[in-house]
Amino acid sequence: MESVDFMAVDEQFHDDLDLWSLSLVDDYKKHGLGVDCYVLEPVVDRKIFDRFLLEPICDPVDVLYDYFRIHRDNIDQYIVDRLFAYITYKDIISALVSKNYMEDIFSIIIKNCNSVQDLLLYYLSNAYVEIDIVDLMVDHGAVIYKIECLNAYFRGICKKESSVVEFILNCGIPDENDVKLDLYKIIQYTRGFLVDEPTVLEIYKLCIPYIEDINQLDAGGRTLLYRAIYAGYIDLVSWLLENGANVNAVMSNGYTCLDVAVDRGSVIARREAHLKILEILLREPLSIDCIKLAILNNTIENHDVIKLCIKYFMMVDYSLCNVYASSLFDYIIDCKQELEYIRQMKIHNTTMYELIYNRDKNKHASHILHRYSKHPVLTQCITKGFKIYTEVTEQVTKALNRRALIDEIINNVSTDDNLLSKLPLEIRDLIVSQAVI
């Protein structure tokens, strides 16, 4: 019987406590106050706190921050856990980025985060990254796995910095799992989110030791070269080609880099850049199959693009341009005539065509043109005035101008009584030519 009385008293006590806590919460609400004010009380009662949580919470990170600030020596983990249920990684990152909080208090918040590692990856993907914030997370247990963190960083659409990539590579450790570097993601978005080309190129140069295969197809079935062409990044395209990118690679959809270069050359936006890229690709050793595929896949009507293709396709096989004969017959004839003329002009046991357009022989073109700058064939090139294969005229003109500058310098030096003027002409020519770019 006595036990029943004690139970009744206990129930009455809890009922009174419930009424009191409810009254307290109501009193707070009447004055427009909420849980954000309650956590400033010297003692935060769990039951009263839970009643406050029946209403939506605004800025839960602020509430948690204030709780830690007031109760840092008397923290109730129950209160912390209940608040964290309302806090997202986005909330924490937003608060971190704002830098409106004391670092020591915010360190406590990060320590109580479910996964500091996931918080780091979220930050890399969803914010403009600052190295000091990354350091703060590392101090609280996050690990910088090189490839995993780079992929998270490239995945985001915020501004990118090569300094962040360098930091990750220098301070990170090898990944525990076999993770592939998703370098393509940095330029896969629409134009508004693309990183500027100089920064992209810097990042690619930093990451090249971690690229297992520069011609590997990414998750979207494209190569890095394909992505760079689509983005219209001239220097990046050239750099990728210099580092082994295969211009004849076929994408998962059956298209090639030449296909996308031809297609992008027809767009209005950044037209000059895309035409320049198209010409860079056309100068590469394209396979017959790649060229035929580009002709088959592209039914463009842009004459600037078509003429550029004809100019270089004619170097491979005249018959490749038969498909364009109806609309650009005269241009094709002009190309053929200029090519035949260039292929007949010989200097130093090689033709002008090989000297200018052959990848192996044109490495020494400037030296040969300088050496034979007074050869009548070079004068013929200037007189002929090629309208399509203008590179011949440009290279020869550059060589002749360089020759004239060197001769002028030698003549000026020879008028003075100095050691250089006493040397044989051939030696003087060699010395001055090394100094003149």
UniProtKB/Swiss-Prot annotation:
InterPro entries in alphabetical order: Ank_repeat_dom-contain_49, Ankyrin_rpt, Ankyrin_rpt-contain_sf, PRANC_domain
Pfam annotation, one family: Ank_2
Entry keywords, A to Z: ANK repeat, Repeat
Listed PROSITE patterns: ANK_REP_REGION (PS50297), ANK_REPEAT (PS50088)
Sequence ranges of the ANK repeats: 117-146, 220-249, 253-290
Family classification: Belongs to the orthopoxvirus OPG015 family.
Alphabetized PANTHER family for the sequence: CYCLIN-DEPENDENT KINASE INHIBITOR 2C-RELATED, POLY [ADP-RIBOSE] POLYMERASE TANKYRASE
Name of the protein in question: Ankyrin repeat domain-containing protein OPG015
Origin species: Monkeypox virus
Gene name tied to this protein: OPG015
